Amino acid sequence: MFDRNKILQLIGVDVWRLRMQKKPPLNDKSKDSWVTLQNEVKSCEQCSLHKTRTQTVFGVGDSKADWLFIGEAPGMDEDLQGEPFVGRAGGLLNEMVFSIGLSREEIFIANILKCRPPQNRDPLASEVAQCLPYLERQI
């Protein structure tokens, strides 16, 4: 296993501060809360993106991982498979994760938006505002 600070320094992140205190492990209700959050995302209709999605892209990996990777929004492949970073960007992310001695199963991967914007356009500020509470709960 690599040292987190050394890895961050190697990729150009010179200053790293934990912004939140580590919290004690959640009780058994945390699993229920995670499932509840997944169901809320799955049934979300807060913005117009729900009309054009194939499915939501909640996130994948270890929900209690030390490493969290956040993308902007799902693309076509992610929308079809329901998993973030599965296209070319996913291959690159897999290589990056592997290079620091981790596997995809040891991290958590999510997007800010949980639905694909049409024609892979950039997310609108209003869409980000609607999805951000979901991401904050995932974090």
Q: What positions do the PLM features span?
A:
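A polyanion-binding, active-site-adjacent surface
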Residues: 2-139
